[in-house]
Amino acid sequence: MNQFKFKVEKEIYDSNLNGRTGVITTPHGEIKTPAFIPVGTKATVKSVLPESMSDLGAQALLANAYHLYLQPGPEIVDEAGGVGKFMNWSGPTFTDSGGFQVLSLGVGFKKVIAMDEDTFRSDEVIADQKERLAHVDNDGVTFKSHLDGSMHRFTPEVSMQVQHQLGADIIFAFDECTTLHNTRKYQEKSLERTRLWAKRCLVEHGRLTRERSSKPYQALWGVLQGAQYEDLRRKAAKDLSALDEDGITFDGFGLGGALDKANLGTIVGWMTDELPRDKPRHLLGIGEPDDLFVGVENGADTFDCVAPSRQARTSAVFTNSGRVNITNAKFNRDFNPIDESCDCYTCKNYTAAYLNHLFRSKEMIGSTLATIHNERFIVRLVERMRTEIESGDFQEFKKDF
């Protein structure tokens, strides 16, 4: 039984913007959108108890299929009752397809990834003297485990099988993630490959849904690529929206691939212009405050990113005045919360001076307290965006932030 639904509630009253609020209904609860989905890559948000994420306002968590496939293995997660039960999280869950991790590890990238290596050799893209761990062909990707060097093969079918075993409420189709530095010719070739992989994902998803009919319904979302090209982004949106394999269609869409920060809103707008209004859109890998504003106003409903927890572990914390490094000397005697307006556990109970001390002393709890703050800050920010859209004050809120 399909227990997945999406309802649009309120749209920004501006002909140039596509922002809206809504509700995603899954077998494990509702997600009020727009919403930020914290990332628990290996079925845990690093340094924070999974069950405590609900106290931070998280409505859902996202885990990574690639990492859970390698360790502990999807069959173990399946036997445990699915990724949510495995990590003691009762709310909705997402898993990504594993495509980004397989492909990015495949070229040993630094800041971005590049599959047509001969086209772009900057050391900002491909790390020097690093072994290529993956090979892409039209059928799938062969890759070497970063854990033990063993060889593996991901195809659209394998990605679906792994994600069905992981048991998340929302799963993503297997796609090829390109970069802004790939040639136009390669982008066209890759876009068609991703479209064909999407068709295969729908077929296998349908088969597995029937085969595992006693399990809660899993919603499959297609992933749009196309880099910085308007025609390719629009084509991807139209193509994936039109796919129908024996009545099986995508329940939502992921806006993926390389996104130029300077043109983020424009690129997201191209895709949301073409996507059906009644299906949710997830902007993959976006979590910086300014990018979230842009994503929301251009029609993205959910977001995920490792940035809040990753940056917290390096002593970087979000504030209403911008991101700061809590180890800076000016915080030595700052006996105020990290952010006076924040309602998180850390800001209610600890001072900036104490976190400064914890990080300088290399105490593990420093990462925990900083992660609690950062995750709550971003979750709450997107919550506030939802409230301001509903009240008609989103643009004023963005201007004042």
Question: What do these predicted regions represent?
Answer:
Residues 1-213, 329-332:
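Non-catalytic, usually N-terminal nucleic-acid engagement modules in DNA/RNA processing proteins
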Residues 1-23, 31-35, 44-47, 174-182, ...:
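C-terminal extensions of enzymes
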Residues 29, 61, 96, 163, ...:
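Conserved, mostly hydrophobic/aromatic
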Residues 74-83, 312-326, 379-382:
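C-terminal helical cap(s) of enzyme catalytic domains, especially alpha/beta-barrels
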Residues 105-107, 337, 358:
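Short conserved micro-motifs at the rims of enzyme active sites and ligand-binding pockets
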Residues 158, 162, 166, 189-200, ...:
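A non-catalytic, amphipathic alpha-helix used as a structural packing/dimerization or gating element
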Residues 179-184, 188, 221, 251-256, ...:
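Glycine- and acidic
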Residues 192-195, 204, 208-210, 215-338:
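Glycine-rich phosphate/ribose-binding loops and adjacent secondary-structure elements
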